């Protein structure tokens, strides 16, 4: 195509020259020239005429004719003012050359007589016209036949049938999801995680998913030791297991898995005897208060889970000098869906990926660092009943009474001995990956992620919900694909392994294919733990995708009798979306049902992983209608991102989110506010000048749409800071929780510098945010400049 276009100007010039020779020859024909009588010149003209005819056939008649038509009467307009009315049309064997009488050397003011061969030429032209007409009619018949016999399921690229998505999603049924869920739960009772991975691969392949395969990584896992951890009261010598039961052989047999799997993966190992100091939630104010009245060096902190990321709180305790942590969940914070009598749980202290290969994939011959633990603290999760025994307090919650929080008085001393024993081993983590290849943009990926059972850990039943939902959508999608339809962009389906130990499977896969994913991933749709309650739909989305989620949720509301108002936010979430948010800057969407109590309580309780019997999915959603709703909402978002010509991302919403994060009385933000205003202006200009015209089908030039989509998919990458506090997102567009509306790294820095007149940490955080906003503003401006230069080039 490029070569053809490049040759057009040369073809035009050559044609013009040859036409010049042709007319010259015609004027020299015997009996028709009043000026030239030389026989040699006449023979030369006839030779030139033959050469011109041959070259015309080689260069292409259509191109030549088009080019000639465009330049008609333009060739000498700069040098000669022609009296066109006085020029009679010349007649030549090829009438398209009559314009060349206007050449300055051949201007005549007489009427030429018709050549003798006119009748023959007329017959020749008539034959061409008849042939062209027959071919045209034949082409119409072929087109009609092909159109009527093509599958009606495949709409043309660039147009989206509004009923297409509903046709795919209507095949998703709650009963099918329930059946799949029960099969998975039953499978978990009898087989290990590798067998479950094989079942998932077999099922996805049978549904028609393309190139379904295992992607395995050998990683370092921190597994439970041969015997459960213990906590012993020094005053009485009583020994307790993490669930509060006295240490005994009988207790171990009755609940062996609960006892073993109630641990903190990647904690330090060993024994520590020290005083227990209640630090509540471990906030900055809590630690300042405690350190004023007690020496905390090498002591044991009694810490509540929630309000801030666990890794951040442990980092603060480690810096303060603590030696161990007894971690628990206040019964007053527990959602109704969790039975407080079974609140043993597991946590992972791994920020993500294989700890022995930080930042690079665990492939063959990779260098492995020696990191059996990720903290110097001995960390042990314990139940609320055990906490009550440690502080000599009655139970915190009774059936009909109000809840009272557990609290150890500061004037009382409790000394305990805690023993933590885990084992680190190299194990294989398996991901299952398959895809549906895109039709027009196969190199652009929408990744849909669920996770499957992980051995040696608490998994509850959330993994079965996650897997059943992604399988239900694959079944619905492939039924359409088998009838000839394909999405414009490639949809990649992933079932991650090792999620409980720190999203290891997704991190390793992301690090393995980082260069490809950085360039090609458009969005990530998370199906992690979709049913955590049954009272409220709780969507989480990147700022650029919130408008799309609102539209889909409102449409879903019109189909249901009850639909309470839904708050859509960009907050930190658990699960395998972590790598895509914090290392690739990819927009994400996640739908989940929550318990109202959970939403009202402290955030980050979801960092705890409860046992199977503590969370009963079928009790929360007996009809599986909630599962069906999550599948359809997620599916509709997937289809729209995968199939719309213009990505349904909103640039202006990012700028508005930045401005909202800077509202209120915040110190040292005047520069940030000024930069945020410039970002908004650039985003508004980009939205009005580029995005709105692109939504008009008449303006959808393929190269222009591709350029626009490339800009849209990389918008959030500007907001990845180099380093964030432990447990905080590197992507600063995400808040800590729904109760905060400011940049999380600024909140942490302000808390850190409260007692100080000036603080380097605050200045560094302000600089990070300023650079991110400036980078985004420059990015939008550069995008506008690219479009402008392309338009100027065309003009």
Curated annotation (Swiss-Prot):
InterPro entries: PA_dom_sf (IPR046450), Peptidase_M28 (IPR007484), Peptidase_M28B (IPR039373), TFR-like_dimer_dom_sf (IPR036757)
GO biological process terms on file: response to bacterium
Mode of membrane association: Single-pass type II membrane protein
Membrane topology (Cytoplasmic): 1-121
Glycosylation sites: 295, 373, 534, 759
Subcellular location: Membrane
Residue intervals annotated with topology Extracellular: 143-795
Predominant location category: membrane
Transmembrane segments: 122-142
Family: Belongs to the peptidase M28 family. M28B subfamily.
Note: The gene maps to 3q26.31, a region associated with Cornelia de Lange syndrome. However, PubMed:15168106 failed to identify specific mutations in a panel of DNA samples from patients with Cornelia de Lange syndrome.
Protein name: Inactive N-acetylated-alpha-linked acidic dipeptidase-like protein 2
Organism: Homo sapiens
Gene responsible for this protein: NAALADL2
């Amino acid at each position: 195509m490029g070569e053809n276009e490049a040759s057009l100007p040369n073809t035009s010039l050559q044609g013009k020259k040859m036409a010049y020779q042709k007319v010259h020859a015609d004027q020299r024909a015997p009996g028709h020239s009043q000026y030239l009588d030389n026989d040699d010149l006449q023979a030369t003209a006839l030779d030139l005429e033959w050469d011109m005819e041959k070259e015309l056939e080689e260069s292409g008649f259509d191109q030549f004719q088009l080019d000639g038509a465009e330049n008609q009467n333009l060739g000498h307009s700069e040098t000669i003012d022609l009296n066109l009315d006085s020029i009679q049309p010349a007649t030549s064997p090829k009438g398209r050359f009559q314009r060349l009488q206007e050449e300055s050397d051949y201007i005549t003011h007489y009427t030429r007589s018709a050549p003798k061969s006119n009748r023959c030429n007329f017959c020749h032209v008539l034959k061409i016209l008849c042939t062209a007409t027959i071919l045209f009619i034949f082409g119409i018949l072929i087109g009609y036949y092909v159109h009527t016999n093509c599958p009606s399921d495949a709409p043309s690229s660039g147009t989206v049938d509004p009923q297409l998505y509903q046709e795919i999603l209507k095949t998703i049924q709650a009963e099918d999801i329930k059946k799949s869920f029960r099969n998975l739960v039953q499978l978990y009772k009898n087989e290990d995680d590798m067998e479950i991975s094989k079942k998932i691969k077999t099922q996805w392949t049978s549904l028609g998913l393309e190139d379904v395969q295992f992607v395995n990584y050998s990683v370092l896992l921190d597994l439970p030791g041969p015997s459960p951890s213990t906590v012993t009261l020094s005053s009485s010598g009583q020994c307790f297991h993490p669930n509060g039961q006295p240490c005994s052989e009988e207790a171990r047999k009755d609940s062996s898995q609960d006892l073993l799997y109630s641990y903190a993966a990647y904690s330090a190992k060993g024994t520590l005897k020290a005083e227990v100091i209640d630090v509540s939630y471990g906030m900055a104010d809590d630690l300042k208060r405690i350190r004023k009245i007690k020496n905390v060096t090498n002591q044991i902190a009694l810490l509540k889970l929630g309000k801030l990321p666990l890794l951040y709180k442990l980092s603060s305790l480690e810096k303060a000098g603590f030696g161990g942590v007894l971690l628990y969940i206040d019964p007053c914070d527990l959602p109704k869906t969790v039975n407080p009598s079974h609140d043993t749980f597991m946590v992972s202290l791994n920020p993500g990926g294989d700890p022995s290969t930080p930042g690079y994939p665990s492939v063959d011959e990779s260098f492995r660092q020696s990191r059996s633990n990720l903290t110097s603290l001995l960390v042990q999760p314990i139940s609320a009943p055990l906490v009550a025994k440690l502080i000599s307090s009655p139970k915190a919650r009774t059936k009909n009474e109000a809840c009272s929080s557990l609290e150890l008085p500061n004037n009382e001393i409790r000394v305990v001995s805690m023993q933590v024993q885990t084992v680190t081993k190299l194990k294989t983590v398996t991901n299952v990956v398959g895809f549906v290849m895109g039709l027009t943009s196969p190199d652009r990926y929408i990744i849909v992620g669920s996770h499957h059972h992980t051995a040696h850990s608490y998994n509850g039943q959330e993994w079965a919900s996650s897997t059943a939902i992604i399988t239900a959508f694959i079944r619905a999608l492939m039924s359409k694909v088998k009838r000839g339809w394909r999405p414009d962009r490639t949809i990649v389906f992933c079932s991650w392994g090792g999620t409980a130990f720190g999203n290891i499977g997704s991190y390793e896969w992301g690090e393995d294919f980082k260069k490809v994913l950085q360039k090609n991933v458009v969005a990530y749709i998370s199906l992690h733990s979709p049913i955590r309650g049954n009272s409220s739909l709780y969507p989480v989305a990147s700022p650029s995708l919130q408008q799309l989620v609102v539209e889909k949720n409102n449409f879903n509301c019109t189909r249901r009798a009850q639909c309470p108002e839904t708050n859509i936010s960009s907050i930190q979430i658990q699960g395998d979306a972590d790598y895509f948010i914090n290392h690739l800057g990819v927009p994400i969407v996640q739908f989940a049902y929550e318990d109202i109590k959970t939403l009202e309580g402290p955030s980050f309780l979801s960092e705890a992983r409860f046992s199977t019997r503590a969370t009963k999915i079928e009790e929360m959603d007996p009809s599986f209608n909630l599962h069906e709703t999550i599948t359809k909402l997620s599916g509709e978002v997937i289809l729209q991102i995968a199939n719309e010509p213009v990505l349904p991302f909103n640039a202006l919403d990012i700028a508005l989110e930045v401005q909202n994060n800077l509202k209120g009385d915040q110190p040292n933000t005047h520069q940030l506010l000024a930069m945020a205003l410039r970002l908004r202006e650039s985003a508004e200009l980009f939205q009005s000048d580029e995005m709105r015209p692109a939504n008009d089908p008449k303006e959808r030039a393929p190269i222009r749409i591709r350029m626009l989509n490339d800009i849209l998919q990389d918008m959030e990458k500007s907001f990845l800071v180099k380093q964030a506090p432990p447990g905080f997102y590197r992507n600063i567009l995400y808040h800590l929780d729904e109760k905060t509306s400011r940049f999380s790294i600024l909140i942490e820095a302000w808390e850190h510098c409260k007692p100080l007149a000036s603080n380097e940490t605050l200045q560094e955080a302000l600089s990070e945010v300023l650079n991110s906003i400036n980078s985004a503003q420059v990015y939008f401006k550069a995008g506008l400049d690219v479009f402008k230069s392309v338009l100027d080039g065309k003009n």
